[in-house]
Amino acid sequence: MANTIGKMFSVTSFGSSHGKAVGAVIDGCPANLELNTEDIQKELDKRKPGTSGVTTPRKEEDKVQILSGIFEGKTDGTPITGVVYNNNQHSKDYSMFKNTPRPSHGDYGWMSKYGNYDYNGGGRGSGRITIGHVIAGAIAKKLLKTKNIEIVSQVIQIGDIMAHSNDFDTVKENVEKNSVRCGDLEAAKAMEELILSKKQEGDSIGGIVETVAVGVPAGLGEPVFERLDGDLARILMNINAVKGVEIGFGFDVATSCASEINDEYYIEDNKIYTSTNSSGGIIGGISNGMPIISRIAVKPTPSISKCQKSVNLEKMEAEDITIQGRHDPCICPRATVVAQSSVAIVLADHMIRSGYIHPSNLEI
C-alpha cells in the first residue's frame, strides 16, 4: 500500500477513520523554520467536521499534537510527526456494511485487494485521512511563505451554480466569510441553499474547487517525467472524491485555437510575464513564474440516506441499503484546504529540488 508522496519534502500518511488516530510524518523539511502547533491547528480547523450545516455533523476537535521535529519553536531538520486522535466514532453505523459494499465507495475494491478490510467509517479510505494532508500542507505553506509564495483555494461551483471570478486578495478574504468557502459572496449564498436543499432530500451534490498559487518562480518541474503539472495532477487525484483535474484552461483547450489561448510574453521592470495565463503557470512541465492555477472536480458524497441497490457478498444476493450515519451533503467546502495543502506539498518539494530552498538549513 502506497502511503508516501514527495522526493525531498516527503509526506507519509497514517491512520484510519475509526482507529485510534490519524496523522502524517513529514521528512525533508529544513531546519530553522519557525513553526508551532497553532500554525497547523488553524489549517485543521478549516477541514474539521461539524462546523456548519453544509458539513457532516460528526463532532471532532481535531486537535493536533506534534510528537517530533520541532525544538525551541523551530524545525530541527528531523522528521515532523503530527497526530490527531479520533474521539467521536460511531462504528455501529457501519456494521451492516461488513459484507455489503456501499455504492460508489471504495469498499468493494478494498475487499477484493486486501481481504481484511476495516469497513468502519471507510477505514483507511475515509476522507478523514486527509488530516495528514493538511498537517503536512500547513508546514509546506509556512515553508513557502519564506519565499513569498501564497496559495488560496475556493469553491467555484456547486451543482450548476458558478462563482464569478475575483482577484487573489478578494478571494483570500472572502473565503473566510462563508461556510461554503467561496470567493464570491453572492454565489456562496446560493450554493449554501442548494447544499442544504440536497441535505433535506437525503442526497448530496458535487462541485469544483480552484487553487491558485502566486509568487512561484520560473523553473520548477522537469520536462518529461516529474513535470510540475504531472505531480500536481497526481497529488490532487489522490484526494478522496476527486474525479478530474485541470491546470489552467484545462479541457477548454480542446475547443480553442492557438491564436486564442497562446500566452504571449512581455517585459516589465526587467521581468518576464505573459499577457494571459491559459497554461495556468506551467508550460512544458516547468513553471513560468505566472500564478499556478488548478481545479478539481469533486463528486457528490456517495453516503446518502436514499435507498440504493447493492449486493451481499456473503450470501451472494441482491440487497437494498440505506446509509445512516453522519455525512457531508457536499464535501467541497472542506476539500478546499485539502487541495490547498496538496498543492503546497508539491511546490515545497519542487522548491527544494530546484535549489530555491536549502534542503537542510533555512539560515544558510
Swiss-Prot record:
Its EC number is 4.2.3.5. SUPFAM superfamilies: Chorismate synthase, AroC. GO terms for biological process: amino acid biosynthetic process; aromatic amino acid family biosynthetic process; chorismate biosynthetic process. Its cofactor is FMNH2. It comes from the Archaea. Reduced FMN (FMNH(2)). PROSITE patterns: CHORISMATE_SYNTHASE_1, CHORISMATE_SYNTHASE_2. One of its GO terms (cellular component) is cytosol. GO terms for molecular function: chorismate synthase activity; FMN binding. Pathway: Metabolic intermediate biosynthesis; chorismate biosynthesis; chorismate from D-erythrose 4-phosphate and phosphoenolpyruvate: step 7/7. Keywords: Amino-acid biosynthesis, Aromatic amino acid biosynthesis, FAD, Flavoprotein, FMN, Lyase, NADP. The keyword Lyase applies. InterPro entries: Chorismate_synth, Chorismate_synth_AroC_sf, Chorismate_synthase_CS. Pfam families: Chorismate_synt. NADP(+) binds at R47. It catalyses: 5-O-(1-carboxyvinyl)-3-phosphoshikimate = chorismate + phosphate. FMN binds at R124, G125, S126, N240, A241, G284, K299, P300, T301, P302, S303, R326. The keyword Lyase applies. This reaction introduces a second double bond into the aromatic ring system. Belongs to the chorismate synthase family. This is Chorismate synthase. The lineage of its organism: Archaea, Methanobacteriati, Methanobacteriota, Methanomada group, Methanobacteria.
